[in-house]
């Protein structure tokens, strides 16, 4: 049995590596499609991440919750699915052999690598730097924050955006390398719409979070590897259910430093001995000091590194012949196949190597992890059954629903005019504190949109992007709030 902790050798038809969204979705799909075949899921974490409450909002838009669950929940639902908690030691792709850290050897027929990404840490071994990646590191952050008066947050992606908004009772210095916050998701206009939310009291959440939460039992048998390196990534509402409050009584205070990165991190002693030692008195006494590339130095209790992830390919590359993309992901074709026979990949670890639709791009978001895991399972099944399969429709249009600063955010197509150069125009409608709507037009046709707030425009705009209707004659009337745009395009 593949869940056994004893060293063994086993033939398994399907092996999936990774207990995150892509891996679990892939394992569930393949286990349900081949109920009489054993499926083995290898995960470095004692908890797995499962999609729940899935809802198809429109043709391509989808909403779902993510629950962390003990692996036995999966095994109870799928009797042919066995979950083994162990990291991968090595892969010999030509021999179809996978070996785990605890000595088990699996000869697979089809393998899907869904090992996700590992955080890009500013400084790997600095005790004053915390990378927030998995559940354990989020709990460590909560613990350290409870006694903190000031933290420095480095990064401008989704986790950084959520973190600076959620933290209370602690001063936050937020260093972003771009000219505006949320550069991955927004342009400067959308960023300016959101900035007042950082300066005001938090907006009340519109709905209660009903996700089940489990904690990691540190004594769980068979746990191996560093959780900071190997644990599956946080869910989109990772901060729900944990209080992110510092030691100060004041509610909040966020100061943003734009267009800068970290140049140096000092301890008290190191700062005293540096060329900046004379500034110690004005900077105050802190456990750590951060020097930014704009020359400014801030003292803080600790530094949060939220600068993104790199594909976690390390265990698989040695001795194999994988094609690797420029972003270091495993290159996959339109059937999620890597360059090694019978090895598939999905989620953050892979890079889409096919010619993409003109209105789709890979962004390593939760939505895409689920879609890729599900589609990879279907491709593996088609391979085994020798059946044809076409690229799924979900890869036709980029679409993502999320929430930032407690505003609903919908991103569609080339929402930031990615790759369009000067060949585009923007239409923008903004109602302060209520909604922000941006449309990207190219050649008179809608190719992207950003919707912040309860706009109810997502389905109409999705249709306009997909059918590529010429909108030239509508001009700015397209965003006229006094006109029901749906009436135009029924």
UniProtKB/Swiss-Prot annotation:
Residue stretches in coiled coil: none
Question: Which cofactor does the UniProt annotation name?
Answer: FAD
Which key words tag this protein in UniProt? Cytoplasm, FAD, Flavoprotein, NADP, Nucleus, Oxidoreductase
Q: Name one Pfam family in it.
A: Rubredoxin_C
Cofactor binding summary note: Binds 1 FAD per subunit.
Its cellular-component GO annotations read: nucleus; sarcomere
According to its UniProt entry, the function of this protein is described as:
Probable FAD-dependent oxidoreductase; involved in the cellular oxidative stress response. Required for normal sarcomere structure and muscle fiber integrity.
Family affiliation:
Belongs to the class-I pyridine nucleotide-disulfide oxidoreductase family. PYROXD1 subfamily.
Which protein, by its recorded name, is this?
Pyridine nucleotide-disulfide oxidoreductase domain-containing protein 1
Organism encoding this protein? Danio rerio (Zebrafish)
Q: Give me the gene this protein comes from.
A: pyroxd1
């Amino acid at each position: 049995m593949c869940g056994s902790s004893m060293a063994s050798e086993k033939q398994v038809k399907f092996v999936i590596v990774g207990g995150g969204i892509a891996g679990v979705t892939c394992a569930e799909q393949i286990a349900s499609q081949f109920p009489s075949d054993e499926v083995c899921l290898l995960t470095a974490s004692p908890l797995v991440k499962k999609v729940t409450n899935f809802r198809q909002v429109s043709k391509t838009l989808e909403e779902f919750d993510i629950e962390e669950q003990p692996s036995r929940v999966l095994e109870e639902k799928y009797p042919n699915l066995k979950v083994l908690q162990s990291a991968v030691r090595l892969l010999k792709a030509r021999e179809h052999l996978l070996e785990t850290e605890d000595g088990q050897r699996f000869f697979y027929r089809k393998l899907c690598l869904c090992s996700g990404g590992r955080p890009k840490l500013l400084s790997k071994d600095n005790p004053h730097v915390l990378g927030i990646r998995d559940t354990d590191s989020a709990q460590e952050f909560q613990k350290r924050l409870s006694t903190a008066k000031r933290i420095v947050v480095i990064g401008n992606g989704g986790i950084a955006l959520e973190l600076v908004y959620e933290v209370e009772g602690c001063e936050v210095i937020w260093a972003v390398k771009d000219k505006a916050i949320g550069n991955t998701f927004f342009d400067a206009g959308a960023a300016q719409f959101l900035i007042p939310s950082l300066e005001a009291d938090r907006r009340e959440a519109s709905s209660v979070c009903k996700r089940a939460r489990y904690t990691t039992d540190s004594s769980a048998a068979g746990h191996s590897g560093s959780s900071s390196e190997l644990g599956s990534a946080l869910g989109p509402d990772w901060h729900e259910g944990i209080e992110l409050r510092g030691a100060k009584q004041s509610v909040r205070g966020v100061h943003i430093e734009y267009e800068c990165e970290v140049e140096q991190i000092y301890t008290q002693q190191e700062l005293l001995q540096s060329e900046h030692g004379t500034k110690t008195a004005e900077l105050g006494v802190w456990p750590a000091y951060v020097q930014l590339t704009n020359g400014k130095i801030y003292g803080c209790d600790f530094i949060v590194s939220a600068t993104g992830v790199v594909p976690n390919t390390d265990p698989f590359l040695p001795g194999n012949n994988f094609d690797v993309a420029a972003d270091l992901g495993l290159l996959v074709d339109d059937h999620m196949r890597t360059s090694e026979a019978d090895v598939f990949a999905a989620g953050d670890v892979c890079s889409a190597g096919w010619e993409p639709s003109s209105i789709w791009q890979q962004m390593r978001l939760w939505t895409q992890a689920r879609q890729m895991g599900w589609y990879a399972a279907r491709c593996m099944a088609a391979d085994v059954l020798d059946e044809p399969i076409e690229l799924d429709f979900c890869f036709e249009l980029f679409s993502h629903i999320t929430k930032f600063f407690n505003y609903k955010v919908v991103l569609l197509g080339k929402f930031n005019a990615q790759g369009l150069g000067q060949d585009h125009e923007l239409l923008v409608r903004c109602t302060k504190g209520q909604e922000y709507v941006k449309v990207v037009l190219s050649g008179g046709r809608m190719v992207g949109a950003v919707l912040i707030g309860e706009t109810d425009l997502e389905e109409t705009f999705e249709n306009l992007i997909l059918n590529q209707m010429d909108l030239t004659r509508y001009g700015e009337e397209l965003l006229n709030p006094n006109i029901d745009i749906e009436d135009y395009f029924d």
